[in-house]
């Protein structure tokens, strides 16, 4: 983490002693993977920060007090109490700690303010549920994420993970491809069981989507992320191998011709 950002957050905590602030998610995950497996993937373009206080207050404090920056913009997303900062080409997402409740499979969750431990419980995989808390310089690892990084395994956090948000399946394939990790047997069995049962129902929707509107957006966002990767064919192959390719389209037939077509798409895209 940039030294001036670390110092600025530390100053904020000194002035707000009852507020906990932590780094969480991909920044911590990739740093640990780099250290444990001596694999150079740690090139942070973004940092996720969670606070038990107001995300807006923390963001405004950083913007006002951080030194030696070229640019600092704030975008607020009120619905989830999150703020995006851009500092010297580094994107910083600040969120107020929250817990989520899905009233029906795939619907956008109802959120409530929570503490850091509860916030970690809402995340997708154990390797993304590791946090570093500033004031006590403490590591939160409630779900053995460090152990799973050592074992190179992807573990879902709970039994309803895929039912709540099946876009996590696509993210799982991205992580498996990019990091060289494998999905745990228990997580794979959950995924196959839920996809086969297909609990996501559309109510009063005029589109042709097979998912509720909010979930359709999350699926498209994950597909957009896939398209950025050079290993698009490998990601599709993984979903097919895991027998959950129907999450994309029930009529997809993945064969060598199909995979060659995906590789050509990536090559053509690279020429424009």
Predicted feature residues:
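Catalytic cores of the polymerase beta-like nucleotidyltransferase superfamily
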Residues: 1-272
């Amino acid at each position: 983490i940039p030294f001036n950002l670390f110092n600025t957050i530390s100053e904020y905590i000194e002035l707000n002693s009852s507020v906990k602030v932590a780094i969480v998610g991909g920044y911590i995950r990739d740093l640990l993977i780099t250290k444990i497996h001596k694999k150079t993937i740690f090139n942070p373009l973004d940092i996720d920060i969670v606070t038990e206080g107001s995300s807006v207050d923390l963001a405004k404090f950083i913007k006002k007090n951080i030194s030696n920056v070229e640019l600092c913009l704030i975008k607020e997303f009120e619905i989830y109490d999150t703020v995006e900062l851009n500092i010297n080409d580094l994107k910083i997402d600040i969120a107020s700690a929250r817990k989520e409740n899905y009233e029906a499979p795939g619907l956008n969750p109802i959120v409530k303010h929570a503490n850091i431990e509860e916030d970690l419980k809402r995340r997708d995989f154990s390797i993304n549920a590791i946090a570093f808390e500033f004031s006590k310089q403490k590591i939160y690892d409630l779900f053995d994420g460090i152990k799973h990084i050592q074992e190179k395994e992807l573990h879902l956090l709970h039994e309803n993970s895929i039912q709540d948000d099946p876009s996590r399946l696509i993210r799982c394939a991205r992580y498996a491809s990019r990091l060289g990790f494998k999905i745990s047997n228990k997580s794979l069995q959950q995924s196959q069981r839920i996809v086969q049962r297909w609990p996501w129902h559309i109510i009063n929707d005029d589109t042709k989507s097979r998912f509720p509107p909010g979930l359709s957006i999350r699926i498209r966002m994950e597909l957009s992320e896939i398209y950025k990767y050079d290993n698009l064919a490998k990601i599709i192959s993984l979903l097919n191998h895991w027998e959950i390719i129907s999450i994309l389209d029930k009529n997809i037939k993945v064969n060598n011709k199909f995979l060659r077509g995906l590789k050509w798409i990536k090559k053509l895209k690279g020429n424009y």
